[in-house]
């Protein structure tokens, strides 16, 4: 473990330094995310105002507000840029520097992202989560219940990030074949955002569509952790959702190893 830490600590530090160096860029993106969350909030407010029911598909306006906030936080913490990084490094030829290092290729990206994710969690995730926990306790929910859901949320959040990371690694490996992933990355991000429930809770989709989406990888990345912390899952549903996350994590890790072995024959160094 100590040897592993020493080997990958520079990548963690690099992730931290990159976030600190480009903090203005990070801040501007977060402002954009917050504006998007406000747009979603007022859209749902208009929907509830035009409805004669206080509940829509089992969600109250308070539930939707909490869902929007935690969807924003969860998306921020589970987002992975590994496919973008691989695509850019393949395009400019700097991928050779990573390939020559005596470290696991995918793990080098993982630990780089973990460095930045730790800072994001401390600066954004933890404050939001603390406020949500306090609000739930003040509203009358049991402390043990709230803390239990929070722990399960964090556990599910970790699994969700790892699933998303290895999914993006698998997608990023196609850069060795196609050489440029910029456009396809944007398309992939939009599709995943829709299917993951980050834009609209899957409970609002037609049953046939929601049943299909519920079992895919995208759902486990956003919808599952958010539904846990919002309190819309009972014990059996939480267990089922976590098992599904474990399943997809194993699949994605195995698939990433398989694809990596296949694409190594396509490696060519561009740039000069």
Residue ranges: model-predicted function:
Residues 1-272:
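Hydrophobic transmembrane alpha-helices and immediately adjacent juxtamembrane helices
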């Amino acid at each position: 473990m100590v040897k592993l830490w020493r080997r990958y600590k520079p990548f963690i530090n690099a992730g931290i330094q990159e976030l600190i160096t480009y903090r203005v860029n990070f801040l501007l993106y977060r402002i954009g995310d917050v504006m998007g969350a406000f747009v979603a909030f007022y859209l749902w407010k208009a929907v509830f105002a035009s409805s004669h029911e206080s509940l829509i598909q089992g969600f109250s306006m308070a539930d939707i507000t909490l869902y929007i906030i935690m969807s924003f936080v969860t998306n921020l913490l589970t987002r992975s840029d590994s496919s973008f990084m691989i695509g850019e490094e393949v395009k400019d030829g700097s991928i050779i520097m990573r390939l020559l290092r005596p470290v696991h290729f995918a793990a080098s990206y993982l630990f780089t992202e973990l460095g930045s994710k730790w800072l994001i969690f401390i600066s954004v995730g933890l404050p939001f989560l603390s406020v949500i926990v306090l609000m739930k306790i003040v509203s009358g929910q049991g402390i043990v219940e709230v803390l239990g859901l929070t722990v399960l949320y964090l556990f599910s959040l970790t699994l969700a990030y790892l699933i998303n990371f290895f999914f993006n690694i698998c997608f990023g490996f196609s850069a060795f074949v196609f050489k440029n992933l910029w456009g396809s990355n944007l398309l992939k991000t939009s599709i995943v955002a829709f299917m993951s429930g980050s834009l609209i809770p899957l409970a609002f989709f037609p049953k046939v569509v929601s049943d299909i989406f519920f079992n895919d990888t995208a759902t486990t990345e956003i919808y599952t952790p958010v539904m846990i912390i919002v309190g819309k899952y009972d014990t059996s549903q939480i267990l089922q959702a976590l098992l599904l996350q474990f399943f997809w994590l194993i699949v994605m890790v195995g698939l990433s190893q398989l694809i990596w072995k296949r694409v190594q024959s396509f490696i060519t160094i561009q740039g000069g």
